[in-house]
Amino acid sequence: MRTRLVKPPKLTATGSYETRNRFGHAVLWTCLLAAPLVLGLIAGWLFGIRLNLTPSLPRGFYITSHSSAANLVEFCPQGAAASISLIRQYRSVGACPDGGAPLLKPAVAFPGDKVQVAADGIRINGEFLPNSAGLSDDHLQRPLDPWPSGAYRVEQGTVWVISSFNSFSFDSRYYGAIPITSIRRHLRPLWTFATEVPQR
């Protein structure tokens, strides 16, 4: 009885072609899906749009405002505040001189305003700011040093920045006034969505 030898089908060329074809489709779809994101980032950079994903303010998009009356300010912290916020990763990598990202906070007190710091929170010209009390530790139980209690008059060339949206916000309740020269730009909300923020 003779054994019949059957030649295996020639799949090399076809398989190679199909592999290249699938790879090409994958690259194409990746480019198509990434294009809107890239275009969005470019448009955001051109039109001054910032995406906020931090819990200090409602998450969403904010746009640059050329009006100094816009109370949301983007600034680079200085001194100990810059070091702590970077070491503890309150800030990501960004464009500030220390290599960290700018902070986005509401400016709540301006030159000439009276700031009263107490254990229960902060008052601006007698008006109490919700969720403004300094905490003894952060959300990971690392120690914090709140700004000393007392009455302060906001000096020329400085502002106080405090977020009432989140009691864990790292702002002037820990480092006092910031120099106006550290402000990079003013912003206003463009499109935001409310999120539940843990309070203490």
Where are these regions (language model features)?
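Extended hydrophobic leader/signal-anchor segments used for secretion and membrane insertion
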Residues: 2-200
